[in-house]
Amino acid sequence: MSVNASTLVADNLADAASLEGLPENVSAGHAAAGTEEHHVDPTALGMTATAWVSLAMVIVILLLLWKKVPSVIGASLDKKIASIRANLDEAAALRADAEKLKAEYEAKAKAAAKEAEEMLAHARSEAEAIVSQARVDATALIERRGKMAEDKIAAAERGAVAEVRAKAASAAAAAAGALIAERNNAKADKALIDGAIDALGNARF
């Protein structure tokens, strides 16, 4: 690699000399000897400042290449790019997971809302059925209680009528007995008894 670097430096210096129209082994001082008006740049070791700057740049580039700085920089950049790409992939994965979780949550929320609506509708239906059945039961109970009350009233009325009739019959019997006792004496009773006996005897025969 050092041979190639030396060759490269020599080629660059030769190109610089040819561009200036000077021989490769001729210094700037000898070239300026042909004219008095030509400005002579200061030289060191037969090289102008521009040549030294070019040489320094070439040396720096060669050092960078020798130390593998571009490859290190490239590797660092590749590593950074890989890290950024990994972060982007992770962010994309996290976003996909978030979207999935969001979709699952929305689906569960919709299912829960639907289930709540169904439960509410079922509860309303059951409540309406219970109220309707309660009305029917209340109506039937009222009718039964009314019937029982009517039956009790009718029974009480019949009992009262029977009691009144019994009392009336007892009073009538007592009055009839008193009237008979008042109008008939023992002689008349004997005649009635004899007549009744005779009537019974005739009826047998």
UniProtKB/Swiss-Prot annotation:
Keyword Cell membrane: yes
GO cellular component: plasma membrane; proton-transporting ATP synthase complex
Disulfide bonding pattern of the chain: none
A GO term for molecular function: proton-transporting ATPase activity, rotational mechanism
This protein's record includes keyword Repeat: no
Transmembrane segments: 45-65
Places the protein is found: Cell inner membrane
Keywords: ATP synthesis, Cell inner membrane, Cell membrane, CF(0), Hydrogen ion transport, Ion transport, Membrane, Transmembrane, Transmembrane helix, Transport
Any single Pfam family the record assigns to this protein: ATP-synt_B
Subunit-level organization: F-type ATPases have 2 components, F(1) - the catalytic core - and F(0) - the membrane proton channel. F(1) has five subunits: alpha(3), beta(3), gamma(1), delta(1), epsilon(1). F(0) has three main subunits: a(1), b(2) and c(10-14). The alpha and beta chains form an alternating ring which encloses part of the gamma chain. F(1) is attached to F(0) by a central stalk formed by the gamma and epsilon chains, while a peripheral stalk is formed by the delta and b chains.
Similarity comment: family membership: Belongs to the ATPase B chain family.
Protein name as it appears in the record: ATP synthase subunit b
Lineage: Bacteria, Pseudomonadati, Pseudomonadota, Alphaproteobacteria, Sphingomonadales
